[in-house]
Amino acid sequence: MPDNILVAVAWPYANGPFHVGHIAGAYLPADVFARYQRLRGNRVLMVSGSDCHGTPITIAAEREGITPQDVIRRYHPTFLKTFQTLGISFDLFTQTYTDNHYRVTTDIFLRLLENGYLYKETMVGSYSETLGRFLPDRFVEGTCPNCGYPRARGDQCDGCGHLHDPQDLIAPRSVLDGAPVTFRETEHFFLDLAKLEPQLRAWLDSVDRSYWRPNTLLFTQNWLREGLRGRAITRDLEWGVPVPVDDPTFKDKRIYVWFDAVIGYYSASIEWAQRSGAPDAWQEWWVCRPDGSSPARSYYFIGKDNIPFHTIIWPAILIGYGDLALPYDVPANEFLNLEGDKMSTSRNWALWAPEIEERYQSDAIRYYLIANGPETRDSNWSWADFVQRVNSELVATWGNLANRVISLTHRNFGAVPQPGALIDADRQLIAATQQAFEQVTTLLEGVKLRAALQEAMALAQTANQYLSDQEPWKLVKSDQERAATVLFVALRTVDTLKTLFCPFLPFSSQRLHELLGYSGTIAPQPYVEETDAPDGAPRLILTGDYTTEAGLWTPSVLAPGQPIHAPAPLFQKLDESIVADELARLHAKVRS
């Protein structure tokens, strides 16, 4: 039977376009994994959406004198366009500003309250004397007490990833007017993490989690080592999910964004089921079986700054609610730097996805971001390296192999030729192809995407060497049967590589699928649909029908006689002048 696989992807704040660090950190790895699992024949549900209640949205709205809804309507469509252009195959990319999400968040809050995992407590809140109001944590900046980073946010430091409260900062100030922040008492609801800690530890210790990435495991262990304490889940805010209690104290408070955002994975699954016409289908990924086992393997693709929210806080919420599936794996990526320096949106030192997706092939961007991906350590986008790797690996290795084999076959046979007797060189390539297929499969199962892509490219190099050694362009003139055998073996390898590369390079893999004489779709793409927001305005979502790729993860069974079509290059060679042009463009926009 096929497995149920939940691919849950980090919810981006709808306050600005994506840069390549966002794509490399969560969305592209999730898509590669989801496409692979669908090809395996498993039942995949890949969900995410725009986080509409994040403080950065409120900050942007206040600075421009517009509403948070206006900010969301500006940037949410840009996310969908980037995902479409790059082929990020969500079953549903929605947003937290929906009636469904508000209902689900309310249900979870009330269940936790009923089960005794929420409590009220008076805390100290950040207050602006100049504005006469409480400030959300992200409206506060100061020096990090842990590492000394001068622009640490009120809830977390971008310099070291440390989580803290605003009063922990040195010289805290308001991001709205730069005025010093004071602190006043205010009452809020807290999630009782200390009460949930024994169950959380039991879950984490129930299996060997060495398959988690080292940094994910280390972050989680460090949090537990320090001991868990209650964490506020409401804030003095005007924008967000209302606190569902009959208490005038909480009339002007809202559920805190970190609590409602992680619930989005669950609420998006419910929305997907409702839209699919099978309103209870979400349960097949979420509701535990009678014996307590999970109905699915749940993978959460995030950046490293969100690890504790997904390995501690979200599992604690699920445990407190009861009978919902806990994460199986949390493949958290490190950060992608740019030309050796950390990306900074405030300085505009970033490579914006809407810009580069217009200038370069989607598969070229996808290839570089995985081949150079920040899986276990920070990595770096370098324009010189991008051009070199696209030209030497995508164009000269994989693209050249596919083009040579298909061109020779189409020109001399018009179809997959009937092979003759095999020699040792043929058998060696056949064995190498089978071995690579098994190795890539194992690596993808372990979410080792970078190594899997390297393994596939190594097979392309081996196949190129086989062609160079066998010289079928000469054999077609002197030994047709031998030429037919060489091209048959090479075609089988190219066809297998098409499948291995498909999760990484869906656009070129689909074109190659058609050149090899297949009908149908091996790499379906997402599309945009329109629905309504709670205020009645049009709301866009991203969805797709990916059933056509199910069960196609097999080594080649290309049969003699199958038509082979005239090829065109799969990838565009990049001119070396691109490096200087892009660096000039980058430096022209940077702010001091």
UniProtKB/Swiss-Prot annotation:
> Which cysteine-cysteine pairs are annotated as disulfide bonds in the entry?
none
Which UniProt keywords are given for this protein, alphabetically ordered? Aminoacyl-tRNA synthetase, ATP-binding, Cytoplasm, Ligase, Metal-binding, Nucleotide-binding, Protein biosynthesis, Zinc
Record's keyword annotation contains Nucleotide-binding: yes
Record-annotated residues binding ATP?
Answer: 345
Name the chemical reaction catalysed here.
Answer: tRNA(Met) + L-methionine + ATP = L-methionyl-tRNA(Met) + AMP + diphosphate
Q: Where is this motif: 'HIGH' region?
A: 12-22
Indicate yes or no for the key word Cytoplasm: yes
Motif mapping: 'KMSKS' region: 342-346
The UniProt record lists the EC number as 6.1.1.10
Coiled coil spans? none
BP terms from Gene Ontology: methionyl-tRNA aminoacylation
Q: What is its main location?
A: cytoplasm
GO cellular component labels: cytosol
- For the ligand (Zn(2+)), the binding residues are 144, 147, 157, 160
Give one GO term, molecular function aspect: ATP binding
Instruction: Report the superkingdom from the record.
Output: Bacteria
Q: What class of enzyme is it?
A: ligase
Cofactor note (record): Binds 1 zinc ion per subunit.
User: What subcellular compartments does it reside in?
Assistant: Cytoplasm
Question: Per its UniProt record, what PANTHER family does this chain match?
Answer: METHIONINE--TRNA LIGASE, METHIONINE--TRNA LIGASE, CYTOPLASMIC
Family, according to the entry, reads as follows:
Belongs to the class-I aminoacyl-tRNA synthetase family. MetG type 1 subfamily.
Q: Which NCBIfam families match?
A: metG (TIGR00398), PRK00133.1 (NF001100)
Assembly mode: Monomer.
Name of the protein this chain belongs to? Methionine--tRNA ligase
The organism encoding this protein is Roseiflexus sp. (strain RS-1)
